[in-house]
Amino acid sequence: MGEELRNTFRSSRFWIAACVCLFTLMGYSAAYWIGSVDEWLEYRESALQLSIGGIFFGGFMLLLPFCAALAHSTSQVEEESGSIMQWRTLRSSVAKYVAIKAGASMIGAAVATMSAFILHAIIWNIIALPCDPTTYPNHTIYFDPSCIFYNWYTICYGLPVYLEITVGIGFTASVWAVVALAVAVWIPDKLLTVTIPSFLYYLWNADVIFFFFG
């Protein structure tokens, strides 16, 4: 597992996935920040609002399956085409090989996406004012009372919200990484490995299952 993870973090795919996540988040927050450049700092959005805005209103979630698949799962296609998979399973066992590949894919996808969100949040906590609705009423976020973030965002400048979203992103990316790994095994093609998970998410997000089955 250690060697697999080292190869994951050294791979250009991992860094491309992390950069795509970061640029997607920045695409929303930077545009919103530049659009309010004429306003006083205390009347602009807080660091928390800018940090999570791209998740709720930007395209981050649409690209999450793509980035999760790209981080490591696509390497499975190379191992199959080069007969490396057969050699590695002969050295150990199929079960151990599957566990290592699945674990590395999940960890690689989680680290790539989580690190992008964390770096994005750090950047905006340096540039913008931390979330403090008591001092700055404009920092108030109107979450629904049933939402878990309703009371959390006022605690320690929204730290519980940052932590929960970070864990949620990592868990979601891990799930999509396993889906992509399964695609890579059944259909050993890099393009399909990254596009099929994205397509499945698009169908799920569009409520296609509800449309057909009610």
Where are these regions (language model features)?
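Secretory targeting signals
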Residues: L22-E78, G103-L181, V185
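Short helix-to-coil transition segments within interhelical loops
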Residues: R88-V94
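Alpha-helix N-cap/helix-start motif at helix boundaries, enriched for small hydrophobics
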Residues: K96-I100
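Extracellular/periplasmic helix-loop-helix junctions in multi-pass membrane proteins
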Residues: D207-G214
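Membrane-interface helix-boundary motifs at transmembrane edges
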Residues: F9, V183-P188
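Aromatic- and glycine-rich beta-strand/loop motifs that create alpha-glucan
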Residues: M1-C21
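Hydrophobic transmembrane alpha-helix segments characteristic of membrane transport
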Residues: G82-M85
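Central hydrophobic cores of alpha-helical transmembrane segments
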Residues: A17-F23, K190-W204
